Design a protein with these regions (language model features):
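Active-site catalytic motif of lipid deacylating hydrolases and related acyltransferases
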Residues: 27-85
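Active-site glycine-rich loops that stabilize anionic/oxyanionic intermediates
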Residues: 38-41, 94-95, 118
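Gly/Ala-rich beta-loop-alpha elbow adjacent to hydrolase catalytic centers
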Residues: 91-96, 100
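Flexible "cap/lid" loop of the alpha/beta hydrolase fold
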Residues: 108-109, 113-154, 158, 181-184, ...
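Short beta-strand/loop motif that positions the catalytic acidic residue
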Residues: 201-203
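Conserved loop-alpha-helix segment in the C-terminal half of the alpha/beta-hydrolase fold
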Residues: 205-231, 237, 242, 250
C-alpha cells in the first residue's frame, strides 16, 4: 500500500511540475510592453492602461522621457528595452511615436503601437508631420519659457489636450506635465522601424493636437492595422480599455509567432 501511495505521490508531483513549468513558459513567452509617453506628459499619463495590461499577465515598463532631444529620449527607451526579456511590443503616444520609430529598430522589438502619434519617415522631423493639414487648435496653447522648453497652458490642457476629462484631472495633468525642448521637434530620425516591424495605429477622432487626418494618413503610409477611438489626444486617459485592447492585440499577434 505504501508503495502504491508513493507512486501516486510521485505522479502527482510530476504533473504539478509540468503544470508549473507550462505556466512559467507561457509567462516567459508573452511579449512585454514598453510604453513611451509624449510631450506635455510623463509616465503617469499611462496609469490607467498599465493595470489593464498587467491583469492579462503582461509585463509593462513605462519610459520616463527627459524630453530634451530625440537622441535623449531614444537613449532612455533603449535602456528600458535592454532590461526586457524576450520579445517587446513598443508603444508610443504623440511625440513618443517619433521616439519608437527610431528606437524600434532594436532587435528585441517585435511590434510597434502608435497611439495618436507621429510616425515619421527616416530623415523627417516631428514638426514636418502636420504639413498640408489644418492646424489643430491646441497648437496655439503651447507656450515657450525662457529656457527653450514648451508647455501646455492650463486652458489648452483642459480644452484641447484632454477635453474629454474632468477639470480636476486636467489640472493635475497641467501640474505634472513634462515640458519638451522646442528643438526636439526639429530632430530628424535616422531609421523607420515600422518598415520592418508590424505596426498598429490607434487614431483619436476628436484629437485637437495632432489632426485626425494626419493620423489617418500616417497609419496608411506605414501600413499599420488601424483602429479608431472617440477620444481627445489622450485616449489612454479617457478610453484606457480601448487602448489596452489594441496593445493586447499586438501582444497576441507577436506572441503567436
Amino acid at each position: 500500500m505504501k508503495t502504491i501511495k508513493s507512486k501516486f505521490a510521485t505522479v502527482a508531483f510530476a504533473l504539478a511540475g509540468t503544470f508549473i513549468a507550462s505556466a512559467s513558459h507561457a509567462q516567459d513567452t508573452t511579449p512585454s510592453v514598453v510604453i513611451v509617453h509624449g510631450a506635455f506628459a510623463d509616465g503617469s499619463d499611462w496609469a490607467k492602461v498599465v493595470p489593464l495590461l498587467q491583469a492579462k499577465g503582461v509585463a509593462v515598463t513605462v519610459v520616463q522621457n527627459p524630453l530634451t532631444s530625440l537622441a535623449d529620449d531614444v537613449a532612455a527607451t533603449r535602456r528600458a528595452l535592454s532590461n526586457q526579456q524576450g520579445k517587446v511590443v513598443l508603444v508610443g503616444h504623440s511625440w513618443g511615436g517619433t521616439v519608437i520609430t527610431e528606437a524600434g529598430s532594436d532587435q528585441k522589438v517585435s511590434a510597434l503601437v502608435y497611439v495618436a502619434a507621429f510616425a515619421p519617415e527616416a530623415g523627417q522631423t516631428s514638426g514636418e508631420q502636420g504639413k498640408g493639414a489644418p492646424t489643430p487648435p491646441g497648437i496655439s496653447q503651447i507656450k515657450a519659457d525662457g529656457n527653450g522648453f514648451l508647455s501646455m497652458t492650463p486652458e489648452g490642457m483642459a480644452k484641447d489636450f484632454a477635453q474629454d476629462l474632468p477639470a480636476a484631472q486636467t489640472a493635475v495633468m497641467t501640474a505634472t506635465q513634462g515640458p519638451i525642448k522646442a528643438s526636439a521637434f526639429e530632430d530628424k530620425t535616422t531609421v523607420s522601424a515600422w518598415k520592418t516591424k508590424p505596426s498598429w495605429y490607434l487614431l483619436a477622432t476628436d484629437d485637437r493636437m495632432i489632426h485626425p487626418d494626419v493620423q489617418r494618413s500616417a497609419a496608411k503610409r506605414i501600413g499599420a492595422t488601424l483602429a479608431e477611438v472617440h477620444s481627445s489626444h489622450v485616449p489612454q486617459q479617457s478610453q484606457p480599455a480601448e487602448v489596452a485592447a489594441v496593445i493586447l492585440k499586438a501582444v497576441a499577434s507577436v506572441g503567436a509567432k
